[in-house]
């Protein structure tokens, strides 16, 4: 099997394109992803535990669902253009959304961290998607057409919120690596889930379940030998040192 170095040499002979900085970066990210995948390989999460922590969605027509609906209706009534604009900033499940928490453009500055988190999140994604499919809760704007979301509509199930899972898990994993930025990372993690309610894409109970599931999944990952081995990777440690070098006074204010 060719190594990253041999692949780069072969590709350079085949095309002038790879001589560009963009191509070199793409190749570097591919190689780092290949490095990160073995670290997360064979990681098994306790699916039953995660399902129990997520719990069940409120039954249709129940008082709990009525409370969910009342919150969504109230938020829609007082939704401002500023709130809508802010929710769009955390639309994508991409590591860059945490850049403001650490004061560095994460996607460019930390390819090893990005690749590693992506690999470790795969079993988390698999777990919540299975629960979502099993529960089959329809989105609030489908059940109640008077609700008009301010972010793009989605056709997947509503419970639990996948965004809440991702933001919660990612915030916990980053906080384990960068405890100095824990509070700021957790703030972004909470806001990423809350935005799904603010814009009417999820019931509050969807997001609460996703946050519980995501936090516990992260704890399981952090306790695993795979994560501990990943933490010791020299490439990752070098990236974390760069992030720690950003002084606290240089960190941007967090959106409120």
Name what the model sees in each region.
Residues 36-198, 220, 231, 238, ...:
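Hydrophobic alpha-helical bundle signature of multipass membrane enzymes
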Residues 16-34:
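N-terminal export signals
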Residues 191-222:
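Interfacial helix-loop-helix junctions of multi-pass membrane proteins
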Residues 1, 12-18:
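N-terminal export leaders
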């Amino acid at each position: 099997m060719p190594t990253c170095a041999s692949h780069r040499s072969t590709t350079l002979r085949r095309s002038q394109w790879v001589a560009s900085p963009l191509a070199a970066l793409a190749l570097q990210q591919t190689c780092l992803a290949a490095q990160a995948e073995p670290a997360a390989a064979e990681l098994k999460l306790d699916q039953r535990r995660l399902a129990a922590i997520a719990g069940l969605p409120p039954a249709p027509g129940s008082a709990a669902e009525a409370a969910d609906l009342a919150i969504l209706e109230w938020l829609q009534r007082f939704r401002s253009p500023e709130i809508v604009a802010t929710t769009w900033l955390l639309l994508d499940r991409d590591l860059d959304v945490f850049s403001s928490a650490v004061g560095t453009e994460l996607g460019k500055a930390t390819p090893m961290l990005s690749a590693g988190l992506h690999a470790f999140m795969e079993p988390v994604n698999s777990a919540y998607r299975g629960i979502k499919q099993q529960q089959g809760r329809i989105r609030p704007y489908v059940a109640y057409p008077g609700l008009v979301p301010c972010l793009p509509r989605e056709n997947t199930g509503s419970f639990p919120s996948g965004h809440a899972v991702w933001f919660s898990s990612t915030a916990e994993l980053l906080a384990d690596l960068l405890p100095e930025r824990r509070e700021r990372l957790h703030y972004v993690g909470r806001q990423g889930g809350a935005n799904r309610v603010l814009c009417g894409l999820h019931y509050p109970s969807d997001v609460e379940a996703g946050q519980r599931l995501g936090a516990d999944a992260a704890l399981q990952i952090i306790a695993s030998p795979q994560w501990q081995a990943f933490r010791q990777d020299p490439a990752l440690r070098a990236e974390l040192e760069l992030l720690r070098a950003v002084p606290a006074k240089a960190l941007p204010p967090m959106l409120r």
